[in-house]
Amino acid sequence: MTALHDLPGTRLLALFARRELSPGEYYEHLLAHIQRWEPHLNALYRFDPQRVRDQAAAATERWRKGQPKGPLDGLPVTIKELIATAGEPIPLGSAATALQPAPCDAPPAARLREAGAIVLAKTTVPDFGMLSSGLSSFHGVTRNPWNLANNTGGSSSGAAAAAAAGYGPLHLGTDIGGSVRLPAGWCGLVGFKPSLGRIPIDPYYTGRCAGPMTRCMDDCLLLMRYLAQPDARDATSLPPEVLDWSAEPLSVRGLRVGLQLDPGCGLQPDAEILAAIEAAARLFEEHGAQLRIVEPLMDRSLLDGLNDFWRARLWSELLLLDETRRARVLPYVHAWAEGGARVSGVDAVRGFNQTFEMRRRAARLFGEIDLLLTPTNQVEAFPADRASPLNDPQRPFEHIVFTVPWNMGEQPALSINCGFTAAGMPIGLQVVAPRFADTWLLRIGKTYEGWRGPIHGWPRPPAD
């Protein structure tokens, strides 16, 4: 029998509607489950069990009367710490940040509350969201439920840990270079970065998106129905549009599917990861897709230019802090950002311009193919005490080569589990579609999920 904490959100809503399970009953089980896990994982921030109980009790009464306040009434959702929730501080993962309550909900949080979801908690992030790691000077170390010695990746580290551990079905992250997809890959999840502007976000920035992190495609689609709503605070958001977020699979026959296995720079993919990606690609071919190998999009000049731009940007922000506060930043992040002081204005601009070169290359590629398959991560989840796979602040982004182009090109990109390593750690397949083809891409993901079958044996708390 499936444990309550393993049920998808779509199933929970059906049970609430039929009064076969109340939000209050579900939350008592869920809170006990979280209490067994959380001392080992450290995934949550601003977790208040009594507040959650009270909100679940109110939702129970509404369902009893047949008057839910929204389509997600009573469902739990976690929200990444970087996404503002009214009245709660946003430490940005760093002990250097002054803790001031947010004046209002950011757009994604507002949409989920309007739909009736209960914000279970915020989730942990590394300093300033600038690591693909669960290390934070404010939150501490967040660990991977599949192996507590390993990293979740980041920067949506707590969201990934919470989803893999079964802290409810719905989780929300953000992604500027892979921060939804990388931890989703390392934790066995569905992680979706939509087209830029599909989910309004505040503050907005070049390449920055919010996106769902779930165990299954149905729950990803469920979240997108309510997240992809207009909000005037995001000047980059797409025009209002009625979209079909149905979960129906579709045929891939005749699709031109590119397979990219060579990153062009950075870390080379492990052999067992390549084998899993090639096996997934063969499924597309067996179902009628036209598979072809495509050349790398990234090269060293693009990656190094982006590094120059990002570190100069963060250093400019750290200079606004006094020396005492700056000293509280995670040493790895401080050492990396401090290098921004040596980046000239000319080099910073050249680095920023590399984001447009990524965009041009991405657009050209999708003139030749309909869909792209790549590894999400080149390597297996790395040790939990590392800030990056190489743990070298002078080479911080060697692992984002497959993910970052689609932030800058603005294409929707999905990570979905396609197997496990010999050590039992998840392997992520990244599937990328042309700009604005978000609903189509998620139906492709649903199709692949059907071929792959469900994941069994989700992690259990150590005491179990």
Predicted regions, residues:
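Small-aliphatic-rich amphipathic alpha-helix that forms the alpha element of a beta-alpha
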Residues: 361-363, 393-417
